[in-house]
Amino acid sequence: MMKLNLFINANETESYIDIHAPKMNDHVQSIINAVNDLDKSHTLVGYIDKEIHIIHISDVITFQVINKNVTAITRNQKFKLKLRLYELEKQLPQHFIRISKSEIVNKYCIEKLLLEPNGLIRMYLKDAHYTYSSRRYLKSIKERLSI
């Protein structure tokens, strides 16, 4: 059980968070990630033909580069974005994982993993398709998924 103390002081010039813990663990890291994600945007602007759509990041299953365009894929739609993948990666919450040079997946949309004999990871996603990680990102993926 974690204890929480909140101190409201009108004399403070800015809000800040102190974390006291006997050691670094998954709970502490989750708190740090949640606090860091507070400043990140929760929506993106996507395009379908000439229509402009507001996309909630939590609805996105994966971001893929398709024909040199970054595409946000949700359960029902594919939206073109005007961002580069590396720009998008900086804006996304911690639960989005870069799995290759051309794809970022939502960790919460991964249904199962299959370790292939060649060392790659096949990821089955909620929209009933699968994708592969690249070897270059394998170590990072395993760390982020705790496998």
From Swiss-Prot:
GO molecular function, one term: DNA binding
Main location: cytoplasm
Localization terms from the record: Cytoplasm
Boundaries of every HTH LytTR-type domain copy: 44-147
Pfam families given in the database record: LytTR (PF04397)
UniProt keyword terms in alphabetical order: Cytoplasm, DNA-binding, Transcription, Transcription regulation
Keyword Transport assigned: no
PANTHER family reported in the protein's UniProt record: HTH LYTTR-TYPE DOMAIN-CONTAINING PROTEIN (PTHR37299:SF2), TRANSCRIPTIONAL REGULATOR-RELATED (PTHR37299)
Protein name: Uncharacterized HTH-type transcriptional regulator SAB2242
Lineage of source species: Bacteria, Bacillati, Bacillota, Bacilli, Bacillales
